[in-house]
UniProtKB/Swiss-Prot annotation:
Residue numbers spanned by region Domain I: 1-64
Region entry Domain III, spans: 148-200
Domain comment quoted from the record: Has three domains with a flexible linker between the domains II and III and assumes an 'L' shape. Domain III is highly mobile and contacts RuvB.
Protein name as it appears in the record: Holliday junction branch migration complex subunit RuvA
Region (Flexible linker): 143-147
CDD domains named among the record's database cross-references: UBA_RuvA_C (cd14332)
Source organism: Chlorobium phaeobacteroides (strain DSM 266 / SMG 266 / 2430)
Keywords of the record: Cytoplasm, DNA damage, DNA recombination, DNA repair, DNA-binding
Length: 200
């Protein structure tokens, strides 16, 4: 029904965003992955949309990238996986990581996500392994090459927190930088993150 919403970002929270489109405010639930990529409040933003229809409610979900929305919809095809759990998966893992876990038959990578048990992780892999090949997602090889190592991100965030910045601000700045330049060292990430924070 809705392809996307484009407008002014009114509110950006870790679990939801509000966008003003021509004077109408739309509340959308988002993943942590999308939250980290959002611009500052008041900026223009485009979020790809998914409308969940239930008997008692209509709920919009927003995604910064189309491939995240595609994977969200694919996860919903799994028995026992609803929008809340699908969003939790996309908050705990990035798109290439989910793709790799499914293709490599590694359920332990999925049940490390809050709310995903061993049986659910096994079902996701069993039911989606063939379906995921039909999506124009990042290939496992390409995804692995582009993914920054976790220690770089963790060390950079820790350093920024030590310098007095909030963990949320540090995580957002570091994640945004590594999204564009995943090959950066810890020192480079800290340097550019500091510049980004001071210029914001």
């Amino acid at each position: 029904m809705f392809a996307y919403f484009k407008g002014s970002l009114v509110t950006a929270l870790p679990e939801e965003a509000v966008i003003d489109v021509s004077g109408v405010a739309y509340r959308m639930l988002i993943s942590a992955t999308t939250f980290r990529q959002l611009p500052d409040e008041g900026s223009q933003v485009l979020l790809y949309a998914h409308l969940s229809v239930r008997e008692d409610a209509l709920q919009l979900y927003g995604f910064f990238k189309e491939e995240e929305r595609q994977l969200f919809r694919l996860l919903l095809l799994t028995s026992g996986v609803g929008p809340k759990l699908a969003l939790a998966v996309l908050s705990g893992l990035q798109v290439p990581e989910v793709h790799e876990a499914i293709m490599a038959n590694e359920p332990e990578r999925l049940y490390g996500v809050s709310g995903v048990g061993k049986k659910t992780a096994a079902r996701i892999i069993l039911e989606l392994r063939d379906k995921i090949l039909k999506l124009p997602l990042v290939t496992p090889a390409a995804g692995k090459a582009a993914m920054p190592s976790h220690h770089v991100k963790d060390d950079a965030v820790h350093a920024l927190v030590t310098l007095g910045f909030s963990r949320l601000l540090a995580q957002k700045a570091v994640s945004a930088l590594l999204e564009e330049k995943p090959e950066q060292s810890v020192e480079e990430v800290i340097k550019y993150a500091l510049a980004t924070i001071h210029n914001s």
